[in-house]
């Protein structure tokens, strides 16, 4: 009886503390009594104290039971930040892919540039080697004209001749003005002193890709050396091929900074000589003020007249330039429409390589301009030649030839009537 009283007393306390699970515990009590029937009397006297001590210890054990699922939920939360970490790796790989693509693009670009650089203008000769070369002067005594350039370019140093560029207008203007009887090219530069009294020199001897690579010190020294050359050979006319050259020369030699420089004869002479100074437009095709060769011929014609005047040669009244007008806008439009390709490339420069230009363009028939300087119109009357009839596709078109008078000592009656009109 005492054991039963103690068991009921302990159950009442447990029921007071745990009201909700009381029914479940009551269902398990008979089984506990059966299994522990022999041990209960020994533990019964201290049962009250044991239950009193165990109840508060068991209470906190059941309290975190609802928190256990929270911990389980936290585990996936803790794992959630790891999930985006895995896609970050392919993100970095994407960046690397972009970088590889950009590298591929850069490689393609560099390959394209390498292809352009492989264009061999000088047949294997490096630019550094050309910079060490110089262009020899073509000077002698009793010259009528000395053409003065700034300094040799790469092509001139490579060819070893003056004004070798196909786009340069010098040789065309020389022929169109009548200073030479036939069309010449850079390979004929050494023959000009004996045939036409024309020589060549430069203000600075050093070869550069452009005149901008020269220093002011080189211009000063070059100006002094040029004066010494002109004082030695004393030509009749010193022709400066471009305004820029004469402006530098005038400042260094005469001490005069020219303002509003005009082409043609200048007021100053070379010191201690009777050599006149004459300024022409640059024969380079890059001259924006005169984009075509025919725009520069006027100043070559005036140079020829000045030379004849100094030599005492009477001018032909039938063949002379009465009036000259120039419209830059019309010239630029005309150059774009008609003469752009012709100005950039001249078949005449193939003569050095045994090209078609070296052959006789007339083929035994009368030409537009004969070798003796007389026009074909003075020999036999012919119809106007179409531009396609120009031999070997030369640069001079029939439309422009009509604008330039023939430079000969005798003219036809038709030319006389036109000149008087």
UniProtKB/Swiss-Prot annotation:
Question: How does the record describe the protein's post-translational processing?
Answer: Sumoylation on Lys-341 by either SUMO1 or SUMO2 induces dissociation of the product DNA.
EC number(s) recorded for this UniProt protein: 3.2.2.29
Gene knockout outcome: Embryonic lethality between 10.5 and 12.5 dpc. Embryos display specific patterning defects of the developing heart; vasculogenesis defects of dorsal aortae, carotid arteries and branchial arteries. Global defects of angiogenesis are also observed. Defects are due to epigenetic aberrations affecting the expression of developmental genes, coincident with imbalanced histone modification and CpG methylation at promoters of affected genes.
GO MF terms held by the record: ATP binding; chloride ion binding; DNA binding; DNA N-glycosylase activity; DNA-binding transcription factor binding; double-stranded DNA binding; G/T mismatch-specific thymine-DNA glycosylase activity; G/U mismatch-specific uracil-DNA glycosylase activity
Q: Report residue spans for region: Disordered.
A: 45-108
**Any single Gene Ontology cellular-component annotation:** nucleus
Top-level division of the source organism's lineage: Eukaryota
Q: Where is the composition biased (Basic residues)?
A: 91-100
Q: Which Pfam families match?
A: UDG
Crosslinked positions for Glycyl lysine isopeptide (Lys-Gly) (interchain with G-Cter in SUMO)?
341
Q: Where is the composition biased (Basic and acidic residues)?
A: 77-89
Q: Where is this cross-link: Glycyl lysine isopeptide (Lys-Gly) (interchain with G-Cter in SUMO2)?
A: 114, 259, 341
Q: Where in the cell is it found?
A: Nucleus
| UniProt catalytic activity | Hydrolyzes mismatched double-stranded DNA and polynucleotides, releasing free thymine
Q: Which GO terms describe its biological process?
A: base-excision repair; base-excision repair, AP site formation; epigenetic regulation of gene expression; negative regulation of transcription by RNA polymerase II; regulation of embryonic development
Q: Which family does it belong to?
A: Belongs to the uracil-DNA glycosylase (UDG) superfamily. TDG/mug family.
What this chain does, per the record? DNA glycosylase that plays a key role in active DNA demethylation: specifically recognizes and binds 5-formylcytosine (5fC) and 5-carboxylcytosine (5caC) in the context of CpG sites and mediates their excision through base-excision repair (BER) to install an unmethylated cytosine. Cannot remove 5-hydroxymethylcytosine (5hmC). According to an alternative model, involved in DNA demethylation by mediating DNA glycolase activity toward 5-hydroxymethyluracil (5hmU) produced by deamination of 5hmC.
> What is the annotated quaternary arrangement, including any partners?
Homodimer. Interacts with AICDA and GADD45A.
What protein name is recorded for this chain? G/T mismatch-specific thymine DNA glycosylase
- Organism this protein belongs to: Mus musculus (Mouse)
Print the organism lineage: Eukaryota, Metazoa, Chordata, Craniata, Vertebrata
């Amino acid at each position: 009886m005492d054991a039963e009283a103690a068991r009921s007393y302990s159950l009442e306390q447990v029921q007071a503390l745990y009201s909700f699970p009381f029914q479940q515990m009551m269902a398990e009590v008979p089984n506990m009594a059966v299994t522990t029937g022999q041990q209960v009397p020994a533990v019964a006297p201290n049962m009250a104290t044991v239950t009193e001590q165990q109840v508060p210890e068991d209470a906190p054990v059941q309290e975190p039971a609802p928190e256990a699922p929270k911990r389980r939920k936290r585990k996936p939360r803790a794992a959630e930040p790891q999930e985006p970490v895995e896609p970050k790796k392919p993100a970095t790989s994407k960046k690397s892919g972009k970088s590889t693509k950009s590298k591929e693009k850069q490689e393609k670009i560099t390959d394209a540039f390498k292809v352009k650089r492989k264009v061999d203008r000088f047949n294997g000769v490096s630019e550094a080697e050309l910079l060490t070369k110089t262009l020899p002067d073509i000077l002698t005594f009793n010259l009528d004209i000395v053409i003065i350039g700034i300094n040799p370019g790469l092509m001139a140093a490579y060819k070893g001749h003056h004004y070798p560029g196909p786009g340069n207008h010098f040789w065309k203007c020389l022929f169109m003005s009548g200073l030479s009887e036939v069309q010449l090219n850079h390979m004929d530069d050494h023959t000009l002193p004996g045939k036409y009294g024309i020589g060549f020199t430069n203000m600075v001897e050093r070869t550069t890709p452009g005149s901008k690579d020269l220093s002011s010190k080189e211009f000063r020294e070059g100006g002094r050396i040029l004066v010494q050359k002109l004082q030695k050979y004393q030509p009749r006319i010193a022709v400066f091929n471009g305004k820029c050259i004469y402006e530098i020369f005038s400042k260094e030699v005469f001490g005069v900074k020219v303002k509003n420089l005009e082409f043609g004869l200048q007021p100053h002479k070379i010191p201690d000589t009777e050599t006149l100074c004459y300024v022409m437009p640059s024969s380079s095709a890059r001259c924006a003020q005169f984009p075509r060769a025919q725009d520069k011929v006027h100043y070559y014609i005036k140079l020829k007249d000045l030379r004849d005047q100094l030599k005492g040669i009477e001018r032909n009244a039938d063949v002379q330039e009465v009036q000259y007008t120039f419209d830059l806008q019309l010239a630029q439009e005309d150059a774009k429409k008609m003469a752009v390709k012709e100005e950039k490339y001249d078949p005449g420069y193939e003569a050095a390589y045994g090209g078609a230009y070296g052959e006789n363009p007339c083929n035994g028939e009368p030409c537009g301009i004969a070798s003796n300087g007389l026009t074909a119109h003075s020999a036999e009357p012919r119809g106007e030649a179409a531009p396609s009839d120009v031999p070997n596709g030369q640069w001079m078109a029939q439309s422009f030839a009509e604008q330039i008078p023939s430079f000969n000592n005798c003219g036809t009656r038709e030319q006389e009537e036109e000149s008087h009109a």
